[in-house]
Amino acid sequence: MIKYNGKIVSETRHGKRGATVTEKERYYLLDSMRGVALLFMIFYHTLWDIINLFGVSADWFTPSLEYMLQRFICMSFIMLSGFCSQIGRHPYKRALILIGASVIIFAVTLIFMPDNLIVFGVLTLLGVCSALILPLEKLLRRIDAYLGFLIFTVLFLSTEWINAGFLGLPGFGFYLPEWLYANHFTAFFGFPHEKFVSADYFSVFPWIFVFIMGYFVYRIFSENKLLRLLKTPRIRPLEWIGRKTLIIYMLHQPVIYGALYLVFLIF
């Protein structure tokens, strides 16, 4: 979901930000991967609207299938964003654009779709993570890339159910005290209160750990001289979609709903 300007950081030993830009190339495969994730998201939201807003029965779309599809989409976007945080320039500008877009979505849903209000959605998360990764990188770069990926994978799995009050792995963990789940401020970090509702909710924890996993994947590619593998293959339709992710993301729901409304009105 992050755009980057096509300029890549040279492959230094540690893959540090700020290394001299030595060539102007684009990792086309990243665009294609974002395009694939976006198409899956459009498919999921179309299916969700058909079932939940237009009342069409779909017994085959089980909760397990829905969960796996949701996880694939969000993990793809967030990890790709963490990876791309090390490509290009102006991370704070990128963060402000994403947070600004999230404010627009909040305002639109508040006015036109209050029953599907979006508070602290994925764009807010990506904006916050994009702003935090630069200061955090000073600490993260000291960690071996493979070890860092493993550590933050475990941290994500251990905090995956923190929104529901549980911390730990299945069969090994504990429930957090209720006083942590106090208000919207705590909800931002991952501790939503009882009356908190959002149609798209991605709190800082646990999802920042997935973003950092993407950062370490970049490190692994950079330190092993593997970034060149992302220049091919060229799949131009997917690349185009991947480069327009933010605007497509912001427009896809009203377009889907409008198209479905016309279809069900006619048929």
Where are these regions (language model features)?
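Alpha-helical transmembrane segments and their immediate juxtamembrane cytosolic regions
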Residues: 2-267
